[in-house]
Swiss-Prot record:
Keywords: Neurogenesis, Secreted, Signal. It is found in: Secreted. GO terms for biological process: neuron differentiation; positive regulation of neuron differentiation. Its main location: secreted. This is Neuferricin. Heme-binding protein which promotes neuronal but not astrocyte differentiation. Residues 231-241 have a biased composition (Basic and acidic residues). Belongs to the cytochrome b5 family. MAPR subfamily. The cytochrome b5 heme-binding domain was proven to bind heme, although it lacks the conserved iron-binding His residues at position 73 and 106. InterPro entries: Cyt_B5-like_heme/steroid-bd (IPR001199), Cyt_B5-like_heme/steroid_sf (IPR036400), MAPR/NEUFC/NENF-like (IPR050577). It comes from the Eukaryota. It comes from Rattus norvegicus. One of its GO terms (molecular function) is heme binding.
């Protein structure tokens, strides 16, 4: 992946993701008079057992028919606790106890809420949407509650954070690293290190990020303008080497592609 082109791809994906999110929000959280509304007691009948009318589950208040995945959700199956209820929190926490199988998502981080959003995408793609659950996320009129609106805001925040992280990774790809009891540690850069394909190699540096307890090794471009000054014709042709959040590794030549740290 070319350096400038790579960043362009990330930005294009960000725009596309935002557009998809906007469409999803209109469908998932908008008003649709024909949508069936469930109350919790009614949904609880859809556990997939003998005599039950079906096999449904809810996620963030949206109800899905998961009969096609019966082996996963029917009584006795690993995910049977999700059937007949909204257990949104457990999709993130992995707590399948009765205390954990709840719809309360308060206290979850933006990244965890984004994980729920990804699960919602999965159910939209693989199962049939059948209605909305009256309660925490939808009112008796079928419209979103303030809590669902907060979830929407956190999804947007989580997507923005992901996009920022991807841009940062394009600028400062992680180093390759290995350790052995015989040779000690080795850090090095390549055109594919960190899973970021690019037209430059870079040199190892410590990157200090705000809020992080320890720095981590990244590969830093050594030529051309700084990433945040691409249009500056008077740059010093040192790439991002002068970024104030970077530090050289003691004992490693400044422009070495590989750093060795013997035992």
């Amino acid at each position: 992946m070319l350096r400038i082109c790579g960043l362009g791809v990330v930005l294009s994906l960000a725009v596309a993701a935002a557009a998809v999110l906007a469409v999803w929000l209109m469908d998932w959280w908008g008003s649709h008079p024909s949508i069936r509304l469930f109350v919790p007691e009614e949904l609880a009948r859809y556990r997939g057992g003998p005599g039950d009318p079906g096999l449904y589950l809810a996620l963030l208040g949206r109800v899905y028919d998961v009969s096609s995945g019966r082996k996963h959700y029917e009584p006795g199956a690993h995910y049977s606790g999700f059937a007949g209820r909204d257990a949104s929190r457990a999709f993130v926490t992995g707590d399948y106890s009765e205390a954990g199988l709840v719809d309360d998502v308060n206290g979850l981080s933006s990244s965890e809420i984004l994980t729920l959003h990804n699960w919602l995408s999965f159910y939209e793609k693989n199962y049939v949407f059948v209605g909305r659950l009256i309660g925490r996320f939808y009112g008796k009129d079928g419209l979103p509650t303030s809590e669902l609106t907060q979830v929407e805001a956190m999804v947007t925040k989580g997507m923005e954070a992901n996009e920022q992280e991807q841009r940062e990774k394009q600028r400062f790809p992680p180093c390759n690293a290995e350790w052995s009891s015989a040779k000690g540690s080795r850090l090095w850069c390549s055109q594919k290190s960190g899973g970021v394909h690019r037209d430059w190699i870079g040199v190892p540096r410590k990157l200090y990020k705000p809020g992080a307890k320890e720095p981590h090794c990244v590969c830093v471009r050594t030529t051309g303008p700084p990433s945040d000054q691409q249009d500056n014709p008077r740059h010093s042709n040192r790439g991002d080497l002068d970024n104030p959040n970077l530090e050289e590794y003691t004992g490693c030549p400044p422009l070495a592609v590989t750093c060795f740290f013997p035992l």
